[in-house]
Each structure stands twice: as structure tokens, then as C-alpha cells.
Amino acid sequence: MNRCLFALLLTAILLTACGSSSTASETTESGIEVHQIKMGAGAQGEDRALYLAMHNHGSETDQLIGASSGAADVVQLQNGTEIVEVIPVYANTEFVFIPDGYHVMLIGLKQELHVGDEIEVVLQFRDHEDLTIRVPVGEATEHEH
């Protein structure tokens, strides 16, 4: 009985550790690291928010000026529901995208995205090179709009 309970507990812990956010990180050559990448599953034509954390390891402030993806008709930078032209990426600082705050919005998914799928999104910076990130698709959240 104890072995079965232990095996069930261990399985639950391992499954929890394999959640929908990416533990991998992507980094530009000049030091902007992107990690904690997550986005929910969705049907074709729906919109989905992409959340992540950006850490600028450099000594100069930069700006995220755009994003693109072949997985959606339109990709926008947003703060809440408002479109923004830039998101500051301050030097030696980490910035976390959150629901109802800054995020990347994928509008009009071109195909249904299931839990476990992965898409690519290109982040465009004012002063750094573009960064292509791999986005794991997880469970949809109540914050999708």
C-alpha cells in the first residue's frame, strides 16, 4: 500500500513539474534573455496571449518594438487590452509579462493549438538582434481575451 501511495505521489509531483511554461530560455548574443515562456491552447481563429519574462543582462536599455509569428494573422504588443508601440527593456533588469499587463497578443490563430504543441515567435528589438523563441502551448487560462 505504501509503495502504491509513494508511486502515485511521485507521479503527481513529476507531472506538476512538467507544466505549460518553458523552463528553457532564449538569449540574444548581446544579452537579453527570455524565459518563463507560456501560452494557452486555442481554436483556429481565436486570440491568445503570450507571457514571458525578459532579462536584459546588458548595460544599455533597449526596447521590444514588435513581434511576429506564422501561427497567427496578427501579432501585437499590448498592455491590458491596449496596443503599445514599444515595451522598455531596462538594463540589468528583469521584466515579467502578466495577465492584464504587458504581453504579446497573437490574433487569429491560423490553426488549432493543442496542449503540447510548440510555435515560434520572433521578438524584434530596437538595438538588439531579433530573437526567435519556441513557445510551448499549455492549458488555456481565464485571462485570454
What are the residue ranges of the model-derived segments?
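C-terminal motif of bacterial Sec signal peptides marking the signal peptidase cleavage site
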Residues: 14-17
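Bacterial N-terminal signal peptides that target proteins for export
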Residues: 1-6
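Compact, glycine-rich, soluble single-domain proteins
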Residues: 19-145
